[in-house]
Amino acid sequence: SLFEDNAEFGLGLRLAADLHTATARKRLEELRDELGDETVDAILDAPQQYESELSQQRARVDALKSRLDSMTGAKVEDLRSVADHLLRRSVWIVGGDGWAYDIGSAGVDHVLASGRNVNILVLDTEVYSNTGGQASKSTPLGAVAKFAAGGKVTTKKDMALQATAYGNVYVARVAMGADPQQTLKAFREAEAYDGPSLILAYSHCIAHGIDMRKGLDQQYAAVASG
């Protein structure tokens, strides 16, 4: 999203998902006598950090729903309606650098400070791409862009450094064209991290004046040049 409410909406989705999960866990606990300790504890205590663990939890929830189909009662219906929320929900907030570094920076900071399990992906073109490629807070020192024909005279805002100040935020910088394996590793680590994460992804753009068919090559060159 370009707009300044992107982070707030994403955090709202996280809060809603957490509320649904808390409700589902409560409904499951209410049926402990009918379902048995083994079934209830297996679901409530299951780790859900990695894909393999999520697959196992998905199988448990499917088995639970099958059992609920053979049961009746108001509590059964209540649990059936929220059973899918026993699976961990992944929330990603995706936006550009104009949003994250500038118009929506306060919202991004609020999300990171919340400590909630929310992932933020910033597609960083280092210019205001949506309005024609003007120099921005994300533009590096010396880079030539609109409104900076002689080279930008100030440095790029270090958003990664700001995020690390909280001490509990997963932070990564990636460029798929420079190192696809590191990019994949960062996404997996951010997804598995139980807390806020921030990935700053260098992104090529038509505003760079390049042949877009060679965008990944340009990413490699940008990283290699420092």
Could you say what each language-model-derived stretch is?
Residues 2-42, 52, 85-87, 139-192:
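Conserved thiamine diphosphate
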Residues 1, 71-134, 171, 177-194:
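Thiamine diphosphate
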Residues 183-226:
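Glycine/aspartate-rich loop-and-adjacent alpha/beta segment that forms the canonical ThDP
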Residues 60-69, 79-80, 159-168, 174:
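An acidic, phosphate/nucleotide-engaging active-site surface
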Residues 1, 107-111, 115, 134-144, ...:
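Short secondary-structure boundary/capping segments
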Residues 1-75, 104, 211, 215-226:
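Patatin-like phospholipase A catalytic core
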Residues 117-120, 144-148, 196-198, 223-225:
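Glycine-rich loops and low-complexity Gly/Arg-rich segments
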